[in-house]
Amino acid sequence: MWYVDGDNKNGESKLAKKAAFNSDFNFNLYEYFHFCSKMLKKDDTQPVARGRSSNSPCMIVFCSWEQQFTLIQAAKKHGFNNHIPLVFIKNYSPQVLKANMRVVGATEYALLLYRDRLPKFRNGLKIDENGKNIPGTGHMVFNWFEWERDGKDIPKIHPAQKSVKVLKKLIETFTDPGDVVIDPCCGSGATLRAAMELKRSAFGFEIDRTFYERAKNEMLVLPTDNQMSLEDYIEG
């Protein structure tokens, strides 16, 4: 519920009970997962050495704490049988008006969803010529990440825009250079920017023309003012 100047004594604002985004009232969660399941490549069937991940794909969905159970159940209906919860820790909170009232939120949440085999996982592990792990390489990746804010070089386009730095960390962990990253709810284009900077091919879908135009003309432009072209990053 939104109130004028944030005070319920002033009555509801004109934005109360309104959709934040065009798709808020007609977003079909099950159609969304059906769409994503068709885009995601099939699980890798090749055997892997003990203690290593497969080259299977995964899907990462940012969500609120309360949405997690609903998403897990919907994902299972479309073949995403497993999940790993992810937490992102911020050193700031948008709940400034509540700072003297209660504990404020300073986290974001996501679900890593996958079908049956653990997805591709890159933690710096190196393999020698005999296929053995090189001691001292590889490190634990916790299920929580620090939320690094972007600098002024990254335009602010979407209210729910994610940090390019955070997205790059996730992309580096679950893909290799040359892999394909797809964002079905592209918004600001931050995912495409992160993928392209890491030499991954990237595709995005966005139904809002305003966000699409701004992402194309602001986010997907290099500091040299040479606009990124998707074709430049798609492997043949």
What are these regions (language model features)?
Residues 1-205, 210-212:
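Core catalytic lobe of class I
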Residues 66, 220-236:
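Class I S-adenosyl-L-methionine-dependent methyltransferase module
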